[in-house]
């Protein structure tokens, strides 16, 4: 990481001296040259090639109308990636990077008395709570219309609320084409995730399909909220009146894993909470799904969503922070949509796997503290 950090700073300096249209080519060439100097062995060379490919992909995927804006957003993204990698391998402190050091994750808030939900304090918590308020409003709106209109009513209400939440989150950024592009990308990706969730939902009637869809979104929001220590998202079973048996079994397994992880995280020191949450969540998912673990394609995506939502909390630039967060939420929704496809095979599995975490889950319900389980 020392080598990558040095190459990064040299490339950034070289790019600052050229015209906007030349910044990325100069940056890439300089970074590549400096990174490869002195490297030896297949592992080191392989790492350099992968990092170079990542840089190219990252730049191409950055949305901005002007070359300078595009390059600036690219640098922000790369800065956060390098800082994250540096932390992972105990490389030099983040303060050695050109951008401001990432703020520490907010201190853990002890569990509130029963019936009271602690206020959101971080930007991510405020964002997910706004989305959650929109979710509840959408559920309420859909409850008052005929079955055939429930999905359409829900989407109209929830889509507007979540899009507004992201727009407000990005409103503090400097105005410009890059910001407008960021908003458009965030909302369009989430809209696509919502549609995928509904398409994947199974139900014999429009109402049953709608209930399965809402359960998917509920659990996705709950997992992300738990990662960020947000307290207001109810379990899927409390959000809808009926969930098809197959879907409920899979969602119950994810929810059981969440409860175990929440309990473990609450008992850990503040600086270790996410590490403990992640490890416990992964282990509990394996335990609750038993021998079917390897065949559940949704599990890696769900685990990735948990990691990515946490990564958003240590990003400094809003454009990076909310893009990372949006990706996490999309992954969680997609994962739970894939879980629905696993519901039918899961229904044939005995209850033995689920009972593997049953005792821990029972204790977790009472002891999960700040997480509202």
UniProtKB/Swiss-Prot annotation:
Q: Which Pfam families match?
A: Pollen_allerg_2 (PF01620)
Keyword line:
Allergen, Signal
InterPro entries linked to this entry: Poa_pIX/Phl_pVI (IPR002914), Pollen_allergen/Os (IPR035506)
Tell me where on the tree of life, at the top rank, the source sits. Eukaryota
Known CDD domains for this protein? Allergen_V_VI
Further information in the entry reads: Its C-terminus might be membrane-associated.
Homology family? Belongs to the Poa p IX/Phl p VI allergen family.
Q: What is this protein called?
A: Pollen allergen KBG 31
């Amino acid at each position: 990481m020392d080598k990558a950090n040095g190459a990064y700073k040299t490339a950034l300096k070289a790019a600052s001296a050229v015209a906007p249209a030349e910044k990325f080519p100069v940056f890439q060439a300089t970074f590549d040259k400096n990174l490869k100097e002195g490297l030896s062995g297949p592992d080191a060379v392989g790492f350099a090639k992968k990092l170079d490919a990542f840089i190219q992909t990252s730049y191409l995927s950055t949305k901005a109308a002007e070359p300078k804006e595009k390059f600036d957003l690219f640098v922000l993204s790369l800065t956060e990636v390098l800082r994250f990698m540096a932390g992972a391998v105990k490389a030099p402190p983040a303060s050695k990077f050109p951008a401001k050091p990432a703020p520490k994750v907010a201190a853990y808030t002890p569990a509130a008395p029963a019936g009271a939900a602690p206020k959101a304090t971080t930007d991510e918590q405020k964002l997910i709570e706004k989305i959650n308020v929109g979710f509840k409003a959408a559920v309420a709106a859909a409850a008052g219309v005929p079955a055939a209109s429930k999905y359409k009513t829900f989407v109209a209400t929830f889509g507007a609320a979540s899009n507004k939440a992201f727009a407000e989150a990005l409103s503090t950024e400097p105005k410009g084409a890059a910001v407008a592009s960021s908003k458009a990308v965030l909302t369009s990706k989430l809209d696509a995730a919502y549609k995928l969730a509904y398409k994947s939902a199974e139900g014999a009637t429009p109402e049953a399909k709608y209930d399965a869809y809402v359960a998917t979104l509920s659990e996705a929001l709950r997992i992300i909220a738990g990662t960020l220590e947000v307290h207001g998202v109810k379990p899927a079973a409390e959000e809808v009146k009926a969930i098809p048996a197959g879907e409920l079994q899979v969602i119950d397994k994810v929810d059981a894993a969440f409860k175990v992880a929440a309990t473990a995280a609450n008992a850990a020191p503040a600086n270790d909470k996410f590490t403990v949450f992640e490890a416990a969540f992964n282990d509990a998912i394996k335990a609750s799904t038993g021998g079917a673990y390897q065949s559940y394609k949704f599990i890696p995506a769900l685990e990735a969503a948990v990691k990515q939502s946490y990564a958003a909390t240590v990003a400094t630039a809003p454009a990076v922070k909310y893009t990372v967060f949006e990706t996490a939420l999309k992954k969680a929704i997609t994962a739970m949509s894939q879980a629905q496809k696993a519901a039918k095979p899961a229904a044939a599995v005995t209850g033995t796997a689920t009972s593997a975490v049953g005792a821990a889950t029972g204790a977790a319900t009472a002891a999960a503290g700040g997480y509202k389980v």
